[in-house]
UniProtKB/Swiss-Prot annotation:
NCBIfam families named among the record's database cross-references: mreC (TIGR00219), PRK13922.9-5 (NF010533)
Any single GO CC term annotated in Swiss-Prot or TrEMBL for this entry: Gram-negative-bacterium-type cell wall
One Pfam family matching this protein: MreC
Protein name per UniProt: Cell shape-determining protein MreC
Source organism phylogeny: Bacteria, Pseudomonadati, Pseudomonadota, Alphaproteobacteria, Rhodobacterales
Native species: Cereibacter sphaeroides
Amino acid sequence: MARDRTRPEDFTRPLRRILVGGLVLLLLGIFLIWRIDSPRVEQFRAALIDRVVPSFEWLMTPMTKVAGMVENFQSYTRIYEQNQELRRELQQMKAWKEAALQLEQKNARLLDLNQVRLDPKLTHVTGVVLADSGSPFRQSVLLNVGARDGIRDGWATMDGIGLVGRISGVGRTTSRVILLTDTSSRIPVTVQPSGQRALLTGDNSPSPPLEFLDKPDLVRPGDRVVTSGDGGVFPADLLVGQVAQGPDRRLRVRLAADYGRLEFLRVLRSHELEPISDPGKLVAEPPAPPAPAAVEGADG
């Protein structure tokens, strides 16, 4: 079959060759122009650049915008990664800070309670909190010291900072501590600097109220509350806490002891009062009955 010379590919193939050849010659000419070191050629190159480059500025603007967007995205990615890394480091630092504070508090308590048990010459005995034996209606804790360590009912307990409660129930190796927040707790206290006497009564709340204040107007929130020593219940001047006003407008005490972290308690040895064996000089002695011999001599 004879080929049809009127087909389009018979004309496009020579045209394609001509265009490719012309493009090669153009590129070769540009290369030669850029490589020739001559003043005239240099002027021609400068004129060509001044003519062509400004006309391509509109074409370079989108490319510049795209390049700027890519650079901004890369910068945002780097900032986001740095932010995430800083957040992780901040969380780790917070955890380390909390652990350091707990260790610092525990170390301070251990340093304050380092005189551990069983020497009768000590003024206090240190015990470890075994368990929280309290309930919604009874707030108390158990200690690992008891009668074998000389512990007795009624002795005050502290956590190294403030008063915690009193001993109520002593076994051979353990003892129970009734907390100041228990409803059965009644502690005579003094509010400083006014010197007002009051009774700290537990009501199962974290901040027990002050009762029987003579002059409540003299008491201000933030005043220091210590034991008064009245009645020989507790030694005087033991730190209890600070005065605070509750939501019910009653004067309450924000306890100094950290009830949320009771690990070690210091049991204060109270000095017993000497029993009174004679009436003393303030009470007159009854008159002695007359001797029988003296009575008979008078009759004779």
